[in-house]
Amino acid sequence: MKLWGGRFTKETNQLVHNFNASLSFDQKFYEEDIEGSIAHVTMLAEQGILTNEDKEAIIGGLQSIRDDIRDGKLVFTEEHEDIHSFVEAHLIERIGDAGKRLHTGRSRNDQVALDMKLYTRKEIKEMEHLLFGLLQSLLKIMKENIDTIMPGFTHLQKAQPITLAHHMGAYFEMFYRDRSRLQDIHKRMNYCPLGSGALAGTTYPLNRERTAELLGFTGPTLNSMDSVYHNNR
């Protein structure tokens, strides 16, 4: 599925297609892309923009695509430019015209921003979990070695006697700060960009608060331009 070039009379040069394509790396967003689309069409149906029949067909199609990718039954191919066109093309192939209404009230810009936020949020949670386990291990070592003496170094030279608990405690503090930074990032980025459109929103009567709620965000982003531009920073 081509996302642009409707005015062109010839096929895009293969080199240009390859240069623009991002499926080789954004395919890792397939779960987030589908999760966001399910929330989006749920909101559209609640707002009366889509029929419930279309909503159910789209959600069923998206879930089957997700399951087939997980099971290795659906393979990513170079004919699609990115994960969004890949999912949408297969959805239309499976459920027909209803699949063409998936993208109602949405732009690739706010869709990409959403996918990146959902993926980043998932990875932050995983890193937090791993850091918590590391902190627990360090704490255990510290408790077991309160009286274990070792040399403390400065300029690669033995300088003062310290305990192993004190030495490991330094790393505990460092990793604790790292975990706090991740928590801060999560707090600041946990706002939903859907509804921002290409840069200035949409005329469809979307319920951005509802979409944000369905996806577990604190709320919707406040400025549509910031929502879609900040990925370039």
Predicted feature descriptions by range:
Residues 215-233:
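Acidic, glycine-rich loop-and-beta core segments that form the ion-binding/anion-interacting portion
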Residues 1-201, 205-214, 218-219:
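A helix-coil-helix interface module used to build multimeric assemblies
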